[in-house]
């Protein structure tokens, strides 16, 4: 098998990680990346935990990653290690630990936006005239 395999944590109460083939068109899949995969008959968001070269599954059973959601991993190595430790210590499914430890927009596969993008920089004189408060309102 020429392609690499990603071990994916799905945010469900399951103790297993699931193997998915990384298509050749996806260049930057690393641990901590969010991906969209087919799980059963649904498309779900998963988190890449590990990259490996081999799997015990046959080629016919191995599904491919459908989409990489972010350009860079959303979970760094330190956070991933913390989630793994919590999962091991409390005997909790890794996918659920990640689900509890991340904001809902990450779990739901939504794009991350930059809060500073496309904001207007105000000049001081513009800010001074923004509010015309009375003396009673200032107290």
Residue ranges and their predicted role:
Residues 1-139:
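Accessory, non-ATPase domains that flank or precede helicase/AAA+ motor cores in DNA-metabolism machines
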């Amino acid at each position: 098998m020429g392609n690499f395999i990603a071990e994916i944590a799905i945010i469900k109460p399951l103790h297993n990680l699931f193997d998915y083939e990384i298509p050749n068109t996806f260049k930057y899949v690393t641990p901590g990346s969010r991906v969209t995969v087919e799980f059963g008959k649904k498309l779900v968001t998963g988190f890449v935990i590990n990259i490996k070269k081999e799997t015990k599954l046959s080629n016919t059973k191995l599904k491919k990653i459908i989409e990489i959601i972010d350009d860079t991993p959303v979970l760094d190595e330190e956070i991933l290690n913390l989630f793994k430790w919590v999962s091991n210590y409390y005997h909790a499914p890794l996918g659920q630990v990640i689900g509890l430890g991340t904001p809902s927009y990450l779990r739901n596969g939504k794009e991350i936006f930059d809060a500073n993008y496309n904001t207007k920089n105000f000049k001081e004189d513009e800010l001074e005239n923004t509010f015309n408060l009375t003396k009673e309102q200032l107290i």
